[in-house]
A protein has these predicted regions:
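Conserved Nudix-box catalytic region and its N-terminal flanking loop in Nudix hydrolases
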Residues: 23-63
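Class I (Rossmann-like) S-adenosyl-L-methionine-dependent methyltransferase catalytic domain
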Residues: 5, 81, 147-151
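Unchanged
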Residues: 46-70, 80-132
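Nudix hydrolase/Nudix homology domain
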Residues: 37-39, 111-159
Length: 159
């Protein structure tokens, strides 16, 4: 069971958390969702029941792949502008390290949401990822510390 932050109140804006997971050859785990086009990384929207972004990341990885993530570091904080009356969204990306070959063999997909998965060389994976995810993942792979982005791009005045 994942720990909950009992005094955490989710913000009014939608928050999602994703995971960068690499295999022992340095290839990126990517997933093909059933409900939208293109490829993405494990992750999803934070629950409104007091879940923290890190808990959301861990839960989504477990639900979508069956993998348990115990460690990670925040590498990207990104804002996405709302479209057609939608609210501004906040996207967080955690680098969750390496998936062993043994763990990779145990991946079990959440079939109603994920149709397939693969570990792809980073350059190939970045080409396959949906554009907003691609920019976040590229920044996250290069980040030595957390990086703040606005719509997938470095914000003016932020270093």
């Amino acid at each position: 069971m994942l720990a909950r932050m009992s005094d955490w109140t989710p913000p009014e804006l939608p928050v999602s958390a994703g995971a960068i997971l690499l295999d022992e050859q340095g290839r990126l785990l990517i997933l093909k969702p059933t409900y939208k086009s293109g490829w993405t990384v494990p992750g999803g929207v934070m629950e409104a029941d007091g879940e923290s972004p890190w808990d959301a990341c861990r839960r989504e990885v477990l639900e979508e792949t069956g993998l348990e993530v115990d460690e990670g570091r925040l590498v990207v904080v990104d804002t996405r502008p709302g479209k057609d009356g939608a609210k501004l969204g906040l996207r967080l990306l955690f680098h969750c390290g390496t998936v062993t070959a043994r763990a990779a063999r145990r991946i079990r997909l959440q079939e109603e949401e994920i149709s397939e998965h693969r570990f792809a060389p980073v350059d190939e994976a970045l080409e396959l990822l949906r554009k907003p995810v691609r920019r976040r993942v590229a920044a996250g792979l290069e980040a030595e510390h957390a990086t703040y982005l606005e719509n997938g791009r470095p914000a003016p005045g932020i270093r």
